[in-house]
């Protein structure tokens, strides 16, 4: 069963189809595991270190490449007006937001951590999804919950370190 509608864009034009499919499969599995509503949407973009660096600089004031960035539509930022989802009809799908992954950073980290690129891409995708769902790791207690759930999902899928 397909829970998520994923709008996937590979800006690198280099990511093998099997890697894209793996990430989509992991996100679908995670969505079912986390009991996300059927028909929920998100966008997933694969980019380069330079591409994610530009986004990181523009939106987070950090002039460096990172592995994954998530933009949650359901999260309120400073000065933003809360969306009243009750105004929309029941046919309007839930849109979680955007996950952006640097494939170059994923390859670097896979080598550093001694596991496969597939495992790293899966980890980053689930990490991004959890951010879209409101999980964070700014505080030690939040980190414990988020990273524990991340490991639980990846282990249940069979993508262990």
From Swiss-Prot:
Its cofactor is Zn(2+). Its main location: cytoplasm. Gene3D superfamilies: Metalloproteases ('zincins'), catalytic domain. Keywords: Cytoplasm, Endonuclease, Hydrolase, Metal-binding, Nuclease, Ribosome biogenesis, rRNA processing, Zinc. One of its GO terms (cellular component) is cytoplasm. Belongs to the endoribonuclease YbeY family. This is Endoribonuclease YbeY. It comes from Listeria monocytogenes serotype 4a (strain HCC23).
């Amino acid at each position: 069963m397909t829970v998520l509608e994923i709008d996937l864009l590979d800006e690198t034009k280099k990511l093998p189809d099997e890697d894209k499919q793996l990430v989509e499969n992991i996100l679908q599995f995670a969505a079912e595991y986390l009991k996300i509503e059927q028909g929920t949407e998100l966008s997933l973009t694969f980019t380069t270190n330079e591409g994610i660096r530009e986004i990181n600089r523009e939106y987070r004031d950090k002039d460096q490449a990172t592995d994954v960035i998530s933009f949650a539509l359901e999260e309120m930022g400073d000065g933003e007006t809360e969306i009243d989802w009750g105004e929309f009809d029941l046919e309007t799908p839930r849109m979680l937001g955007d996950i952006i992954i640097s494939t170059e950073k994923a390859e670097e980290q896979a080598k550093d951590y001694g596991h496969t690129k597939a495992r790293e891409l899966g980890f980053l995708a689930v990490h991004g999804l959890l951010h879209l769902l409101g999980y964070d790791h700014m505080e030690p207690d939040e980190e414990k919950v988020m990273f524990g759930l991340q490991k639980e999902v990846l282990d249940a899928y069979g993508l262990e370190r």
